[in-house]
Amino acid sequence: IVRNELRRYIVENSKIPVVSYSFNERTSSSTLLTRLEALSTIAKRRELMAREVQVGITMGVDSGSSTTKCVIMKDNEIVGTGWKPTTEVLKSADDVIAEALAESGLKMSDIEAIGTTGYGRFLIGKHLNADLVQEELTVNSKGAVYLANAQKGFATVIDIGGMDNKAISVNDGIPGSFTMGGICAGASGRFLEMTSKRLGVDITELGALSMKSAGGEDVPMNSYCIVFGTQSLVNALAAGYKPEDVAAASCHSVAQQVYEQQLQEVDIKEPVIMVGGSSLIQGLVRAMGRMLNTEVVVPHHSQYIGAVGAA
């Protein structure tokens, strides 16, 4: 409580953003760079981040660890989207751009400005001669509150990604405190991908399967380490638990880890907005809502959140 109050006091009275680390987190050089970039962005680009309306024709490309996304916006409306698994960074980007252009009916020459974000932002930014190359913490928070119609006041953004997770406390569209990372891939969307493969369903079907269960809290599940988590999956199925209960238990385990490791590090305010591809897994959203005792908001186009923020 004291830590949260001190953090809130610093943010509200000094306008200095606060980045948090959980005590058990193993921070990599890439996540440290992202954090430092975010602090710099918040300090230097507050006016840009405070914009509430998109104008003209712009494109955002989000090169994530698992998927690459593209969004084209025209006068505050999404007119084109593209999505595909990340393989070769530049080829994946070119493919999703082609998809978005085809859907929008526009040509590359029609695009007035380009923004890139995600792990491949620098490479793609150079490839496209982008006008904005920005880390995903500030970009995702902006995209989240924009799509959730929560640009005024407080909000909490949760993004459970393929390699790391982000929890961001936002006020008037600008992050105040945030944390990023996790101990192991067992606490990320990667574990849910592994769960779906073990259950013989596509990751896009895992959410519907998990919702057939009451919650799966009674299924022993340890995803603190992805190796032990895999063993838990095998043991649960061998013990006769139904696939839907195992799916729900995996969602509950990931939500619990994010809550224990990261959501203690930010000041949680409603609305709580879940974004990213994992937000389409209904069982995970349900588990997070139960963990926080609130109704979690999943906006339309939530899987394109980084691309929307970049655009």
Predicted regions and their residues:
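Adenine-nucleotide phosphate-binding core of ATP-dependent small-molecule kinases
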Residues: 229-260, 303
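Glycine-rich phosphate-binding loop plus the immediately following alpha-helix
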Residues: 86-90, 172-212, 230, 303
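Short glycine-rich, Thr/Ser-proximal phosphate-binding strand/loop in the N-terminal lobe
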Residues: 60-95, 99, 176-183
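Conserved phosphate-binding/catalytic loops in two-lobed NTP-binding clefts
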Residues: 13-27, 131-137, 289-308
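Conserved phosphate-binding catalytic cores of ATP/NTP-utilizing and phosphoryl-transfer enzymes
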Residues: 52, 121-158, 166-173, 259, ...
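Gly/Thr-rich phosphate-binding beta-strand-loop-beta motif of the actin/hexokinase/Hsp70
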Residues: 52-77, 154-171, 215-219
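An N-terminal assembly and electron-transfer interface module characteristic of large anaerobic redox
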Residues: 1-59, 75-77, 82, 87, ...
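Glycine-rich phosphate-binding loops at beta-strand->alpha-helix junctions
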Residues: 118-120, 253, 266-291, 301-306
